[in-house]
């Protein structure tokens, strides 16, 4: 089919139309769609582009010589009857010359040369064919002579056997006749004797008659016995003669069948004849080449119909035809008319036999046979596979996947994936874990479609709605989070509401934990979450906003809107939580509530009196003014929200804070959001699971159950859960353990994959930056929120020259393992509201490990910052100490040039450095070699005095030069 457009041409080439369009555009042929017409010129340009892109040059070979050597075997019997194998080797050589159309003369010469070569090649091949035909004719003549000799010998042998058989039969007949004559003679004698006795008996007396009768009876019995023996002997001789005749007949039939098979084999047309040489033909389609390759020198390829008909005939004889008789001569005979010689069958059976120059037995080989083409031999059963369109697969890529699994999903070898990764700049192995993003890039690079797979994990077993559809939704208390800038009075405000003194117990008077409390008011229960206001506790404030229903934004009337105030507003807006503004410290003389309102309006928090939806309540945590109005507004907002949650259902909640207690183990503060949490329930929180062994309220009193919006402290988890993790109650501990272990493995795989992905980038960064100072730290904190905040604050201190390296961070006391880790990594241990035990302190003293304790996050950050400043390389500064004018120059042997100078400004010291200025241009910078006044060496010369000076490695001093004397000082740097 003629290809008139891009789609038809792509179908003809068996390739996607999109790939063909890209190749056409790369070749400079502008085609926009698959329906665009395609001319022969466009095809020629595409072909030229593809040849150039695959490295084709104008210096291609103009002449190709193909040599073919074909070795085959024939098998025949020699004069002694033994089978011999004769090797027949046919060598063919063909030269293809590419004509050059550059000039007419060159073309004619090439044409003439090609004709001469073709003629010489034709003559040579005809000579080879003639010699081969003579050889085959000679072999056939020898075979015919051998066959005639065998036939003559067989005829002579049969004649001798027939003569011997006739002689033997004649001898047997003569012997039988003699035995019969002897028996008849004996019977006649006995009869004559009996007659004589009868005659004598007539003359003898009567008393002898009984005796004579008995004797006659005995003689008759003996006569019958002799006749029976003679008859048996004659029958036995006849049977033996018939058996011998049957055996002779069988041998004769076998010999005739063998001779007939030999005659048929000789009459079969020879397939070894070499065909006449033909001019080179154009390349045939692959299918035609395959069909030709299936024929061999002695076994030409049969048509499909004939081959199909021959297969069932070989398995079972045709109905009605007699089964072939078993030939005694090794079953080498065949039915007439098969047209196949015994040589061919024997050669086929001996395919595995190696011959000189041919490892395949010389049978069933293609064009690339021979010693150099042994690896190219193909089995005749294989067939050519036409090129097919590449298969584009949809590969579902999970969060992490190994290289081997990714290759298996694409049905390719892992080495192909490794090659692509090497091109992308990553050296990987088949067992290396890739993250999802990298794996999807590799899949798309290999031409497949990458899809982010859904996790096939045990968490899918969790019913989406653990809460039953029939669970009754009941009103629940609101969860109120108090947020604001540090030192704006959030905790003091809560203290007044709770009638407690929490702020006084916090180190430094600032909140460093999330506090969860519930307060009973005349209008109902309210749960408060107190969040830190320090800038380091961003993640902690985000968790507070996530779990809350209403936000109380505390702003000091004397301070106004600060950075953490803005951050709290953004957290509340991101969670869609209504804001109630409490303007605190109105009892101070410098309080300015109106300025606070204006600043909050600029941040998008508009008071109700200005037409907004945020109530503003002026309060004082010190005097208690406005507290009732604040609670009234909070409960009013809760009524508007219509907060409800099921009570009679498995509990769900969120981890507000978690820590490792030395006596209690992992302890988590949980805010129940729905359902009822009871003591003894099996809970799952992230990678931690366990049974609730004890449950305490915010005052430390034991409680048996907690309903919605009630904060409790639970014990019994397997490890410290992450703050902000979701808590869920499961029916049995086995399912909780299974899901927790799966999450741990997934977290580890994701972490390793991300580390591997970032390894190359970090390596290149370190190479580019050169030497970077590292400050290794091990951080242990009392609760996870404080640990997170401290780690983030310290990591922000890193610069291009000094970097904070967090070797390990965890919750709990400082143990011996932490000290051993610090010894190995040369790290400093920071304990935030934790202490080291006795064994850890002793080990730290023995190894010289520095352990620092802090209760306030300010102090920890400031001291680490000071330590990093000490690690910075000092800054070098030049300080000019004096100016010197050269008045006279002296040449001193073995010393060099000495300048007689006058100190015009400042002071010149022996250890100072010098710049030489000529016409106010620096021509040399170096050091003083000597400083003398008169003949004495001096340490310094002050302004207004003369001196002699010589410089190291510089003698080009002239009168009128100026020396600028300076010193280099090092100045400590700070972050």
Curated annotation (Swiss-Prot):
Q: Name the coiled-coil region(s).
A: none
* Highest rank taxon of the organism: Bacteria
| Swiss-Prot/TrEMBL keywords | Cytoplasm, GTP-binding, Initiation factor, Nucleotide-binding, Protein biosynthesis
Query: In what ranges is there compositional bias, type Basic and acidic residues?
Result: 48-63, 120-177, 212-263
Region (G4) location:
584-587
Positions bound to GTP: 484-491, 530-534, 584-587
The cellular location(s) given in this protein's UniProt record come to: Cytoplasm
| Chain intervals for the UniProt region annotation (G3) | 530-533
The record's listing under CDD domains reads: IF2_eIF5B (cd01887), IF2_mtIF2_II (cd03702), mtIF2_IVc (cd03692)
Region annotated G5 sits at 620-622
| Cited InterPro entries | DNA-bd_dom_put_sf, EF-G-like_DII, EFTu-like_2, IF2_assoc_dom_bac, IF2_II, IF2_N, P-loop_NTPase, Small_GTP-bd
Name the residue ranges with Gly residues bias.
Answer: 359-372
- Please give the residue ranges the record annotates as the region G2: 509-513
Predominantly, its location class is cytoplasm
What GO molecular-function term can you cite, just one?
Answer: GTPase activity
Question: What are the record's GO terms for cellular component?
Answer: cytosol
> What range(s) does the tr-type G domain occupy?
475-644
Q: Positions of the region G1?
A: 484-491
Q: Where is composition skewed (Low complexity) in this entry?
A: 178-211, 302-330
Region of interest called Disordered, as start-end residue ranges on this chain: 48-85, 98-390
Q: Which family does it belong to?
A: Belongs to the TRAFAC class translation factor GTPase superfamily. Classic translation factor GTPase family. IF-2 subfamily.
Q: What does this protein do?
A: One of the essential components for the initiation of protein synthesis. Protects formylmethionyl-tRNA from spontaneous hydrolysis and promotes its binding to the 30S ribosomal subunits. Also involved in the hydrolysis of GTP during the formation of the 70S ribosomal complex.
Q: What is this protein called?
A: Translation initiation factor IF-2
